[in-house]
Amino acid sequence: MNEVAGFPTRAFGDDGIIYIFKSIAATMHAMNKIIVEKPTSYCEAVLRMEKTSVHRVYHDNHYGYTIEDDNELFGRLILEINQAGLSWTTILNKQDNFRKAYHQFNIKKVAAYKEADRQRLLEDAGIIRNRLKVDAAIHNANIVLQLQKEHGSFKKWLNTHHPKSKMEWMKLFKQTFKFTGGEIVNEFLMSTGYLPGAHVESCAIYKKALKSKPAWKNK
């Protein structure tokens, strides 16, 4: 995922259409020749979708909201890591499969995975069968366990380091975890409320997300 002018630029497919946000483009209506501008933010594009769309459900109820539970924070990190090189639509469509395959994102259970579990994941067509990403999930689970011992919880570790600039967060995650490049870290922190940008202020969900008291509002 890239970022332009402070907004996330997720690429995703919906009904065969790939949107690249913050691009200035238009399409010609086949019947009446009306020029229609493409959405300028993830929020604008998603709010044009059906309420049952996986993007709409995620955007309206999860994206940019505070997460208190360590397992859910870890699960979000797994999903963001697996999105690398793929569309977010693919990950959202497989999120229930990920949850099941990784034992509800239970950190202790994932940290204890052995070779048999690794092979099980690599053979599971319901998730992303990438060895580097699977290995990163197991490795990172063990790192989170250590952070819990040292700080009380994964959440408290994040809070201890907040606030940081995006570049500072990227450096910290690179030093701490595996497979956490800049865009993965940026999206993880925006999606969990540590960095701003998940919703534009004109978005109908902006104020709703603020009610969850995201960390970026309390610097």
Predicted ranges, named:
Residues M1, F12-D14, A25, A30:
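A cross-taxon signal for low-complexity, glycine/charged-rich
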Residues I24, M28-K219:
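HhH-family (HhH-GPD) DNA N-glycosylase catalytic core used in base-excision repair
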Residues F7, F12, Y19-F21:
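Aromatic (phenylalanine/tyrosine) cluster motif
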